[in-house]
Amino acid sequence: MSYDLETAEHAAYAPFFGYMGAASAQIFTVLGAAYGTAKSAVGICSMGVMRPELIMKSVIPVIMAGIIGIYGLVVAMVLKGKVQAASAGYDLNKGFAHLAAGLTCGLCGLGAGYAIGIVGDAGVRGTAQQPRLFVGMILILIFSEVLGLYGMIVALILGTS
């Protein structure tokens, strides 16, 4: 059986899309995690000048941003395990499903990391001035984190079906 670029069902380039899905899951979630970590860390450093005793309590946004990168790692490893050679029956349908899974996880992670960074920065600065804001900041951070979790769940459903 020969595989050429004209064969629609088992195209030789189908695994490319699957690997692009795995790569995009990792790349975009790590970009979101990096932004969230950096933005939150700037707020922690600014707050630490006024209230150094609150630094350890304010590390929560940085930890939550780092978890976003783990979501991408999980999805990328699952997708990598599902991609096969075109000669083994890997078709364009699977390739596009894996690309969609990777983009779903990656872009949800990017948005979640962005939200965590902004909320974390403003939240730790506000908590330094008014400690009652801490609970509200944590709730908003949880809602932001769940956006990345939703993306991972949808990506796992797309990637394993």
From Swiss-Prot:
Q: Which GO terms describe its cellular component?
A: membrane; proton-transporting V-type ATPase, V0 domain
What GO molecular function terms would the record report? proton-transporting ATPase activity, rotational mechanism
Please state the protein's primary subcellular location.
membrane
SUPFAM superfamilies reported for this sequence? F1F0 ATP synthase subunit C
The membrane spanning regions, by residue number, are 16-36, 59-79, 99-119, 138-158
**Is Transmembrane helix given among the entry's keywords?**
yes
Key word Aminoacyl-tRNA synthetase present: no
Q: Which residues lie on this side of the membrane: Lumenal?
A: 1-15, 80-98, 159-161
Q: What membrane topology is annotated for this entry?
A: Multi-pass membrane protein
Keyword terms, alphabetized: Hydrogen ion transport, Ion transport, Membrane, Necrosis, Transmembrane, Transmembrane helix, Transport
Site Essential for proton translocation — annotated at E145
InterPro entries xrefs: ATPase_proteolipid_c-like_dom (IPR002379), ATPase_proteolipid_csu (IPR000245), ATPase_proteolipid_su_C_euk (IPR011555), F/V-ATP_Csub_sf (IPR035921)
The annotated subunit structure for this chain is: V-ATPase is a heteromultimeric enzyme made up of two complexes: the ATP-hydrolytic V1 complex and the proton translocation V0 complex. The V1 complex consists of three catalytic AB heterodimers that form a heterohexamer, three peripheral stalks each consisting of EG heterodimers, one central rotor including subunits D and F, and the regulatory subunits C and H. The proton translocation complex V0 consists of the proton transport subunit a, a ring of proteolipid subunits c9c'', rotary subunit d, subunits e and f, and the accessory subunits vah-19/Ac45 and vah-20/PRR.
Identify its protein family.
Belongs to the V-ATPase proteolipid subunit family.
* Role played: Proton-conducting pore forming subunit of the V0 complex of vacuolar(H+)-ATPase (V-ATPase), a multisubunit enzyme composed of a peripheral complex (V1) that hydrolyzes ATP and a membrane integral complex (V0) that translocates protons. V-ATPase is responsible for acidifying and maintaining the pH of intracellular compartments and in some cell types, is targeted to the plasma membrane, where it is responsible for acidifying the extracellular environment. Involved in necrotic cell death.
The record's misc note reads: Vha-11 and vha-3 are transcribed on a dicistronic transcript where vha-3 is the upstream transcript and vha-11 the downstream.
**Protein name as catalogued:** V-type proton ATPase 16 kDa proteolipid subunit c 3
- The organism encoding this protein is Caenorhabditis briggsae
